[in-house]
Amino acid sequence: MASSMASNDFQLPPRFFTVFVSHFSSEFMVIPVSYYDHIPHRFPKTVILRGPGGCSWKVATEIKDDEVLFSQGWPKFVRDNTLNDGDFLTFAYNGAHIFEVSIFRGYDACKEISEVTELEEEEEDSVISLSSEDTDTGAKSEMKNTVPEGRDKGKSKVEVVEDSDDDEEEDSVYSESSEETETDTDSEFKVAKPTIPKSQKKGKKKEQVVESSDDEEDEEEDSDSDYIETFGQLDIEENSISEEDSSYAPDKEDTATASFVKPKVANKVANLKRKEAAKKRKKVDPMIKNPERYLDDPKNIHFETNVKNRLYELLVHAQLVKDYCLRFGDYVNYIDRFGKLSAKTAKWKDQRVCIKRWMRICKRNKLKKEDRILCELLRKGTFVYAIKLHVIRGKDL
């Protein structure tokens, strides 16, 4: 009788909400700290996101930098639901490894009704244990981190019970510093909430344009100087528009059509030390000798870079984009010795382009500070659809 009464007393926790911002939430999504009080202490490592119409997606949970977040599987949820900047999402944990998700489109605040079902075969769940006391099982696979349980409570121990994973990306170990983590968690994420635009017409693609101040444009040369650039000799002729790179072809021909719709997105995240840090940077001479010999086509546009503190994205120099009138779509493919990896692009007002998932490239290639990477741009005319990566180890320079 007592057990039945206890079960009847169970109530679903309240919902938490978030506004989708592609610059921060394309690869992972952080669960608010204030919601930790409403999820079980033994939190599953794999959960189901049940979207509009009962459609489901399997998503992994992780603890990074004292935060619980949705990681593997979240980018697929974003793509399948075509989330755009300004979309409003609510989440409620139902106590059975399932989050009920509602989506409200930013352009009209209407609730989404249904999407395509994308539920993968469930595997045996491991758990993230949230407990008020340390537990010592002696297992080598356990990692202990201290995170706040809630805004008004003390700190609790988080024990992540790791499962063996055959994924080569998980097996590879990349160590730079405690500040460089694959979660792309940056101080920008916690400083301020950017202003989100509302589209006037449904169905139009949105291109992320980050406003940069006049000061940033004035110091463009300094801010981009941490990337070592070596440009291939290329004459842009009218007939070059029809030429294709022979080494690789995009999956769909229509990807060569770039979107030029530029809503006014103002990113107001402050970086007070940007100007000071930019002045301290010094340009470094290219270290790769005769880079053309590494390229699939010596005439392709290319630039040289190495492992930086800013690991979560690759920067394409604004001057390079201007010189060759380069165009990028919403996604571009990295190509390395492991294959192809699709990554989202972020386009700045001053024409620099940032490409996400660079951390994963660094990890799976086990890059070190002394290594150099030659980035070869594969294109149709001026449209860049892929970046071929040639890794030259420090000992070979």
From Swiss-Prot:
Q: Name one GO cellular component term.
A: nucleus
Location of the protein in the cell: Nucleus
Question: Where is this chain compositionally biased, Acidic residues type?
Answer: 161-186, 212-227, 235-246
Q: What name is this protein filed under?
A: B3 domain-containing protein At4g34400
Q: Which UniProt keywords apply?
A: DNA-binding, Nucleus, Transcription, Transcription regulation
What are the DNA-binding region positions?
14-107
Q: What is its main location?
A: nucleus
Molecular functions per Gene Ontology: DNA binding
Q: Which Pfam families match?
A: B3 (PF02362)
Species this protein is from: Arabidopsis thaliana
Instruction: Show the segment(s) annotated as Disordered.
Output: 118-255
- Annotated Basic and acidic residues bias: 137-160
Give the SMART domains listed for this entry. B3
